[in-house]
């Protein structure tokens, strides 16, 4: 376990890989075009997929957690050993978690100097664990309740949470595979803690248009927040994007069609996958603000061979990274 660093050192160290964009301020583009890596890693023996990625940069290295599946469709979770460059992901060790944290979200909660790993399918609808060393896959605390509510008209129940904070509040966003995105909130002074049982619908559309894998970010240098949501299209999974001026505000569609998505087959530049699915934008720093640099957007995502088919929980998902063209 590494010695604990100060809050300032930890937060600043997370910006190392993106420091080149610090001097400039960019707006989000009106249309997106990306380049893509090939698949960056193969699951180790016993796993059929690596999926549902969450990523922070700390001490100049990527820390990536993910869900796993096996040949029977059973879920688990894992973490890669920290690595500096995406090209190193294939050789990074893959470390199974002894207690699963499926569809994870990792971040550093600066006000309490603690790392948070939020996830689903734990003791409550959403749960969280804490740690002083996020690189240790099995160094997390016992599970604590993050959200205990339920939703109607959903075959999955609450799914695919993300957590983000501003100066005064923490917010929980999640999906339900039912065309709705939900939000709950609490005072930042009470976090980490339980968001309770109540939530509100902040977006509503068809199931295919608002399916799952919601993520929310602060846009660096702008009074703006960015939400991305996975959708089901005719050519595969893709992300739609929305913006808002505050985390408690209304969301407006930004890049919302399959032919002009935030990220999808139409604009990903990927040749190995038609699907751009559950992932995480690379953040400026690892803290609860989830800040991204619009001058240097990268998306860690899950993709799969276009010829693969069968039960969703047995599909061979792999990690890839999109880099925004500038």
From Swiss-Prot:
Keyword annotations from UniProtKB, A to Z: Carbohydrate metabolism, Glycoprotein, Glycosidase, Hydrolase, Polysaccharide degradation, Secreted, Signal, Xylan degradation
SUPFAM superfamilies associated with the record: Arabinanase/levansucrase/invertase
Glycan-bearing residues: 307
Compartments in which it is found: Secreted
Disulfide bonds: none
GO biological process per UniProt: L-arabinose metabolic process; xylan catabolic process
InterPro entries documented for this protein: GH62_arabinosidase, Glyco_hydro_beta-prop_sf
Catalyses which reaction(s): Hydrolysis of terminal non-reducing alpha-L-arabinofuranoside residues in alpha-L-arabinosides
Keyword Chaperone: no
Signal sequence extent: 1-24
GO molecular function, one term: alpha-L-arabinofuranosidase activity
One annotated Gene Ontology cellular component of this protein: extracellular region
EC top class, as a word: hydrolase
Principal location class: secreted
Pfam families, per database record: Glyco_hydro_62
EC number: 3.2.1.55
Family the entry assigns: Belongs to the glycosyl hydrolase 62 family.
Known function: Alpha-L-arabinofuranosidase involved in the hydrolysis of xylan, a major structural heterogeneous polysaccharide found in plant biomass representing the second most abundant polysaccharide in the biosphere, after cellulose. Releases L-arabinose from arabinoxylan.
Name of the protein this chain belongs to: Probable alpha-L-arabinofuranosidase axhA
Taxonomic source organism: Aspergillus terreus (strain NIH 2624 / FGSC A1156)
Recorded name of the encoding gene: axhA
